[in-house]
Structure formats: structure tokens, C-alpha cells
Amino acid sequence: MSMSDPIADLLTRIRNAQMVAKPTVMVPSSKVKVAIAQVLKDEGYIDGFQVKTEAGKSELEIALKYYAGRPVIERIERVSRPGLRVYKGRDAIPQVMNGLGVAIVTTPKGVMTDRKARATGVGGEVLCYVA
């Protein structure tokens, strides 16, 4: 059965794994998921990730990050979804927690944070908020 929202599945798997203090989480891989994982790594929300291929299926293994026994990601939520896409222009890209968190945005120039999208001067689809 096909998945209707693979990005929401990625975020939910990360959230659930952190609630039970798992060191890693495995999700089916795609280019967008790898780009989201790269943004999370660059922003310091995860320790790292790698793409593993077994029996022709590619999976993304994400190493979760904890500080003093608590997950670094306090909140991760989907914004744009298949039933209601959320697009913002370069001037309307939202800040998360007054700049303490990040909004992950997919733009014509790739997947990036809200700060980088504003600095680059591009808008796009707001995928999720991370804090």
C-alpha cells in the first residue's frame, strides 16, 4: 500500500523514536527525506544520517541527538500536507519561536531553512517546523 504523506511519516517516526529514547530510526529513503535530514544535521537537531541499500530498497538511517537525556528536538510538526499545501513568498516565510526554531522550506533552489530562504530571497512550500 502506498503512503499518502511520506514526509509526515518521517517526522512521526523521528518523534516516536525520540519519545522512547532510541539511538537511531530507519525510514524509507527519498531525495526529499535526505535533503530534510541534511538540514536537520546542519542545524544540529540530529547527529547524522546515512542511506543504506538492502535488497534493492533504500533506507535512511537517522542518528538521533539527545542532551542531558532529553531529545534535542522538542517539537517537530508538519505544516504543508497533501490535502492543504502551504506556500509562502520570500517576505511571508514564518519564523519559528522568534528564530529559536527553524521552518524547513522546499524552494526552487532546494530544501533549506527559513533563514537561508529569506537570505537567498526565495519562497516556497513550508514543509515543517522544528524546535
Curated annotation (Swiss-Prot):
Pfam families referenced in this protein's UniProt entry, alphabetically: Ribosomal_S8
Gene Ontology molecular function, alphabetical: rRNA binding; structural constituent of ribosome
GO cellular component terms listed in the entry, alphabetical order: ribonucleoprotein complex; ribosome
Classification via PROSITE patterns: RIBOSOMAL_S8 (PS00053)
SUPFAM superfamilies in the record: Ribosomal protein S8
Keywords assigned: Ribonucleoprotein, Ribosomal protein, RNA-binding, rRNA-binding
The keyword Calcium appears for this protein: no
GO BP term, pick one: translation
UniProt-listed InterPro entries: Ribosomal_uS8 (IPR000630), Ribosomal_uS8_CS (IPR047863), Ribosomal_uS8_sf (IPR035987)
Keyword Protease: no
Subunit-structure text: Part of the 30S ribosomal subunit. Contacts proteins S5 and S12.
Sequence similarity: Belongs to the universal ribosomal protein uS8 family.
Entry function: One of the primary rRNA binding proteins, it binds directly to 16S rRNA central domain where it helps coordinate assembly of the platform of the 30S subunit.
Protein name: Small ribosomal subunit protein uS8
The organism of origin for this protein: Verminephrobacter eiseniae (strain EF01-2)
Taxonomic classification: Bacteria, Pseudomonadati, Pseudomonadota, Betaproteobacteria, Burkholderiales
